[in-house]
Amino acid sequence: MSTDFILAVDQGTTSSRAIIFDKKGNIRKIAQKEFTQIYPKSGWVEHDAMEIWGTQSGVMREALEFGRVKPDQIAAIGITNQRETVVVWDKETGDPVYNAIVWQCRRTSSICDEIKRDPQFVKYIKENTGLVVDAYFSGTKVKWILDNVEGAREKANAGKLLMGTIDTWLIWNLTRGKVHATDYSNASRTMLFNINSLEWDKKILDYLNIPESMLPEVKNSSEVFGVTDSHTLGGAEIPIAGVAGDQHAALFGHCCFEKGMAKNTYGTGCFALMNVGDKPVYSDEGLLTTIAWAENGKPTYALEGSVFIAGAVIQWIRDGLGLVRSAEDSEYYATKIDSTNGVYLVPAFVGLGTPYWDMYARGTIVGITRDTKREHIIRAALEAIAYQAKDVLECMKEDTGLDLAGLRVDGGAVQNNFLMQFQSDILQSEISKPKINEITGLGAVFLAGLAVGFWKDKQELKSILTTEKVFEPQKDSQAVAHDYRGWKKAVERSKAWAECYS
């Protein structure tokens, strides 16, 4: 039987998904299942690792069944996953010793504070992992499990425990324990991996007291990791051939293969990544340096910036203020007026991310007069999403010296044509919206397909990624500069608010 399809395993923070793609990039079937979010204490977030595996294997079988695709028609599997979330499990039984600690979890802040008392070590971590010291990343989460779960430290020292990010956990289960591996992109998000020497960093491992025997083998993002166990998917041994963290997979799915190409994902927040080529670029502007993907032992690096509140500000004007009935209504109201009339909304509801990194900033609306109507507030909320993206992309230009070679976009908010046009105006750059919505899954199958010869090269991938709409700047640069100065002034008003008035 011919292998006509590739299966994307898309394991996210709130749901497990499986997507079957054909050779033209068309989607044959999507299956999705949400799973439990566990909050043991304030600021703590966990997932049941067995539930993750159960839901993920379930949706894979469901996609095959309802897509009417036989397992032996699948040429390869590509995995993309929520990053930084980590699992520690028993090497013999395969049972987790504790729940997966999720990327959002802040329980290891005190460990990070302790590390920060040593500025030289903080500098070492940034220069060698590309990351800042933060509870966000996997390393301190592993230390917490070893220090706090009874018997874990002893078992780890005896070589009886394994650890891995979610991709590693899925690969282990798909192969029934035959393969313990990760890819370069996921490894680069652990705060344990040296992105210069491309190996686990012994100095950091020793500092956190994590035995190297726990760590997975690091492989290329496009490479055959192993095959599914014959009992996993209807008897077929399917190559697992592509692996990348979700944001990295999206960059690859957008075909951002050249230096200076960037993508922005508009979800609850925003994640912007720029391809910076075959050498790491370290940021003076609060960006993270990461490995985008690796092929044939050669990494491609990226700069990453994150915005905490993007689409969530539209949810707020809908649910919190009642200014719109649906997110779609925001475009209608924003286009009823020509401008915000000097109103700016800074959605710093949980502080500000890149490049400000102010956890005490709070949401602010400035420029209100008696003439201000709800349309002005709604438009200001949408414009804030674009301004924040510009903040991040300006930092990338500053750090790299590269001009933005257009911006590829994905996520729910890209359906808002007003927002996309304003984004193009404020960046003075072309914005490309693809026809395919499932860009993250597409990136995973692109990586897998290249590894098994399903697609011959990146040129063929580019022909699959078709553009639905291109937005060109319609506003002159002087007007843009004037509006952006106003945004910067509004941001200054929002800073340190909770510090002063809490």
UniProtKB/Swiss-Prot annotation:
Activity regulation comment: Inhibited by fructose 1,6-bisphosphate (FBP).
InterPro entries: ATPase_NBD, Carb_kinase_FGGY, Carb_kinase_FGGY_CS, FGGY_C, FGGY_N, Glycerol_kin
GO molecular function, one term: ATP binding
Entry binding sites for ATP: 13-15, 268, 311, 315, 412
EC number in record: 2.7.1.30
Reaction(s) this enzyme catalyzes, per UniProt: glycerol + ATP = sn-glycerol 3-phosphate + ADP + H(+)
Keywords: ATP-binding, Glycerol metabolism, Kinase, Nucleotide-binding, Transferase
GO biological process, one term: glycerol metabolic process
Pfam families in the record: FGGY_C, FGGY_N
Domain of life: Bacteria
Sites where the protein binds ADP: 13, 17, 268, 311, 412, 416
The keyword Transferase appears for this protein: yes
Family the entry assigns: Belongs to the FGGY kinase family.
Record NCBIfam families: glycerol_kin, PRK00047.1
Protein name: Glycerol kinase
Species assigned in the record: Francisella tularensis subsp. tularensis (strain WY96-3418)
